[in-house]
From Swiss-Prot:
The keyword Ribosomal protein applies. InterPro entries: Ribosomal_uS11, Ribosomal_uS11_bac-type, Ribosomal_uS11_CS, Ribosomal_uS11_sf. The lineage of its organism: Bacteria, Pseudomonadati, Pseudomonadota, Gammaproteobacteria, Enterobacterales. This is Small ribosomal subunit protein uS11. Belongs to the universal ribosomal protein uS11 family. The keyword Ribosomal protein applies.
Amino acid sequence: MAKAPIRARKRVKKQVSDGVAHIHASFNNTIVTITDRQGNALGWATAGGSGFRGSRKSTPFAAQVAAERCAEAVKEYGIKNLEVVVKGPGPGRESTVRALNAAGFRITNITDVTPIPHNGCRPPKKRRV
């Protein structure tokens, strides 16, 4: 006797109107995470995960593609307004914010939370090319 297949109930995505876009722009990669106001992650994307490897991963275009992919991932939550929090000195800082704006989000404010040492750790030695 065949058993009837048990259907899992489809999870309903919660509707969130306001979100926070956390952009971590390092010299090697750019990570974009969109959360709700409480900090629960709704979607994320990276430049490396978007198909860029090696030195192309650390370009503004790779950061733009990562932001577009992250925006697509959170469209189903109905986010309209975004607060942007940027951390790090990387090349993808500005292009990520532009891409989120072009994706249809209304950016309410931009905050820079790059950690600045009060003369803490010794920085890496200068490159000699």
